[in-house]
Amino acid sequence: MPPHTQVIATAHSLADPESFWSYHATKLHWHRKPSRALTRHTKTLPSGVSHEHWSWFADGEISTSYNCVDRHVLAGHGDNVAIIWESPVTGSTETYTYAQLLDEIEVLAGVLREEGIKKGDVVIIYMPMIPAALIASLAITRLGAIHAAVFGGFAPQSLAQRIEAARPRAILTASCGIEGSKGPIAYRPLVEGAINASKFKPSKVIIWQRDQLRWNHPDKRNGQRNWQRLVKSARGRGIKAATVPVKGTEGVYIIYTSGTTGLPKGVLREAGGHAVGLALSTKTLFNIKGPGDVMFCASDIGWVVGHSYILYGPLLVGATTILYEGKPVGTPDAGIFWRLIEKHKANVLFTAPTAMRAMRKDDPENAFIEEVGGRGGLRSLRALFLAGERSEPSIVNVYQKLLGRFGADGATVVDNWWSSESGSPITGLMQNSRGAIISSSSSSDAEGEGHEQGQVGDEKSLALRPGSAGLPLPGFDVRVVDDEGNELSSGTMGNIVLGLPLAPTAFTNLFMEDERFYHGYLKRFDGRWVDTGDSGMLDGDGYLHVMSRSDDIINVAAHRLGTGTIEQAILSHPAISEAVVIGLPDPVKGHLPFAFIQPKTGYIPEKSTPPSTAGGHDSHLPAKPSEKLFTEVNTLVREQIGAIASLGGMIQGRGMLPKTRSGKTLRRVLRELVELAVKGDYEGFVNVPPTVEDGDVVDVARGRVREYFEGRAEKARL
């Protein structure tokens, strides 16, 4: 049997990156075509350290904004829908065609130009999930400037850090955000507090006024401007801005990701590689090829997934993107995703596993998907993509069965693995792998609408493997190595690394921090590999299994155990919906695996009162689980991993697992709480990052930890 076309495409991209990426670059419009795709060179840092470096499409000139909007309008697709905004928190829906979107972008870009924004400037976007945020991003890009999106609602100190790091000429913001059922959250005190705390002062703050809560009397003396008034004035005067192309290696955006020192790292996305790689990814991995296709990425523009697959990816290929202001549950219920898919005939849903867990928790019998799917409302849905954290097999299996019943023919769940640094998925299962194969006939058609019929391979969908994040995608050379950088055999867990160069969507540097880039990603393995910070293994067929962050490895009596592996075993218990494993300090073994579990809705522990219907965090549920449940879980762990992984303890509860806005569980917070509790300190400081979704959850976790360890100490005294 011939290899799958995804395997063929990835192998070609690594063996001959020049021909592979030069061909796919022809699918876009270049203001100046690049003479070559890849340039390799040696970079010498101020410290004297030298390392291998690379650049993509260095002498080309391109406009991402033009490729996302103008070229589709010029091709006669101006009446096609570009953006659908659904906001259940405000009861609003809006639709923008490509022609309408272009008009909005041209005028806002003209406004920004009049406000002093020019090529190379940085502009921070601090906004909720509203169309103005996407329009702002594309208007900034149109001027050749660089946008740096920050989650709307971030605390002033966190925003101040990003202001100091990015040194923006302006901040584009809104009068308020709306967090689920909590109502409007005023942005004014957050933005002004951040500017006051920052040593660097942006010259302008441009405010989108929302009806739900106004930013009254903007302070013009300090550069505050009313967004809608500026646009109205510019439109009345016929002010519009033309496209300003940038070099292939110049920035499109900066996205800040957490750093081990606590200071955010600014990942710089470069124009040429970003556009070429993202267009290919959207077409081949997601099978969103162009007009008529609809992508529903339930993410946030403050996260890399939102940048890539709410904003840029769908628009680069001329498809429709759904912009969603709401939550997976509670706005108004766990059926909102399925109803929106039905309403707009979405072909792809992309979200985080935590969203699916939340929907399962609120709808354990799958009543909502049964209702919508039962009337044929999900027949447009070809795939459910999951990313942001590890997708445990149990959640993948549940939704694979549901998609098989209600989705399009062949609908599948696709787990994919990537990062802010990579810009697009590193691994996954292509849904349109043929689109990645280079045409054997020609690669010369400038806008790239030719037929792609290269080397013949197996084009059937790759087999889903629950617990795996799929196979490597073009441009990413995925390896697993030991701590010395030596490659490991298949099935052996180690450090997941990437060979150089990285794919075009990936970063080649941090914004104005060359030394930090080297020390954070290249130094550990002497510049040979890029350290992803994740641990896992490649199986015999090349599928990647990401088990945990490297810093989530637990050393138990000299055995290195991945928390993700243990969590997977725990989640095979039918009564448990979520599990987080950390290391419990132990004087003999160094650490013992220690679990936080969330029982499924309806679970009634032994020796407890019936569940309350009053809400809250289930105060009837003791922090310490029953001996029966603990024994059953430990049996599963020993059977699936071995006795060395036996749990040293377990805390149960609901609403106690802190997560970031992007859905990642904050294991470090739980680990710090436990490490303090072991010392008898239940009120000690814990470093909670600004990305936390709900700070109150940390207090719930602290209370559960205290209850458990005080009970344990009392038992030890008896």
Tell what function each PLM region has.
Residues 204, 554, 580-586, 594-596, ...:
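Conserved C-terminal "lid"/linker of ANL adenylate-forming enzymes
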Residues 79-81, 205-213, 218-256, 263, ...:
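Conserved pre-ATP/AMP-binding loop-to-beta segment of ANL
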Residues 455-456, 460, 471-475, 486-523, ...:
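Conserved ATP/PPi-binding loop(s) of AMP-dependent carboxylate-activating enzymes
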Residues 65-66, 79, 83-138, 155-160, ...:
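Conserved AMP-binding/adenylate-forming core of the ANL superfamily
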Residues 273-294, 304-348, 361-362, 367:
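Conserved AMP-binding/adenylation subdomain of ANL enzymes
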Residues 150-175, 342, 349, 446, ...:
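AMP-binding/adenylate-forming catalytic core of the ANL superfamily
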Residues 138, 142-229, 352-353, 615:
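Structural core segment of the AMP-binding/adenylate-forming
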Residues 319, 347-350, 361-463, 477:
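Gly/Ser/Thr-rich phosphate-binding loop
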